[in-house]
Amino acid sequence: VANDVETTPSAAFVKAAIRDMKAYLKKKGLSTPVGYADNDDMHIRMNLINYFNCGDKDSRADFYGVNIYRWCGDTADFKTSGYEDVTKNMTDYTIPSVLTEYGCNLVRPRTFPELKSLYGSDMGNTFSGGIMYEYSEEDNKYGIVKVNYGDSKVEKNDDYDNLKKALKEAKPKTIKIGDYKPSGKDSVCPKPSDTWHVKSEVLPPTPSSARCKCMMDSLGCTFKSENLSADEGKAVGEAVGHICGQTSCSEISYDTVKGNYGNFVACDPTQRSAWAVNKNYLNQNKAKCEVKGADTKTVSSPKQEDQAVCLKEKDDVGNAGSPSSNTGDSNSSGGGSSKTDSSDKEESGSESGSSSKNSSSTMLSMQPLATLLASAAALFYLF
């Protein structure tokens, strides 16, 4: 997830995943909304807010969540806590906004004074409620009950009763569907900058297992096993880093700032690494197929002679195949030659080979979200 300036390139892949999830759900006849939740970083907040609600409607988030822990204790208020600023950021937003996490625990027991604003006039016209973090008490001390796993009994703490009281006192204003007249404006996509390392108009390609398998079937030099050990993976990573430092690996690379995504960038790390090893094999006129620390093999007659054919394979959502935005080199493994341009130094937001940024996208499906909210409401109604 994009948690700071340096990790903003991950936003492109998260938005692509939203696009693909929505397309898949649509094909299955489902209309479950898919949203995104940010971590309330002041340096990238507005770029994220705008990015996930701009451009192609099929790629936009269906709702936007903010994980916020600013309102700490009863001495803070709507203005001093920073909630006012967050609310202003979402004014005129065209998709629902939710506090996907709230409940600062710097002052305990928590009394949840922010609920008066969240469900009152301060925020009620902008936010569609929120989710308190969290139910069970863990090491981080955010829970409202203590649980012993294997025991069905729970022990409520003061936070539980305080949250129950705050929710009971909340008086959210309802509105009839006929009176709902949205006045929001579509967001403008952010441009690449020192704090935003993404070309917003271009998204990574939808993964295609068939395309990646076809590519693997075209290689004349590859690994003996598709499942590399940890030691092999480390050795391969170093080898691919060296290879892609000497020659263009644009087919397995991406540059989010320029909006370039290789045709095989969505393949798994082993497949992308095999592509690079094969590229090196071709560059050496098939003289050597080896990676120190990993078992490799040569294939005298690959099943697929031309990688360009692989680009016609359907993606995993079922869409017809097409080349990615990258215009990098696509080579045949059997007997073709490969262009060996030296790669440009990578800018922030670019990556190649088998090394990939470990970022987990924070996407939410509204269906479980609605279930959670309903369960919470039932919980406090009953107890």
Regions found by a protein language model. Give the residues of each.
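Glycan-binding loop/region signatures in secreted carbohydrate-active enzymes
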Residues: K141-K153, P190-S218, E238
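A recurrent domain-boundary module in secreted/ectodomain proteins
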Residues: D158-P204, K297-N326
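Noncatalytic carbohydrate-binding groove/subsite architecture in carbohydrate-active enzymes
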Residues: V5-G120, K153-K156, K181-S193, V198
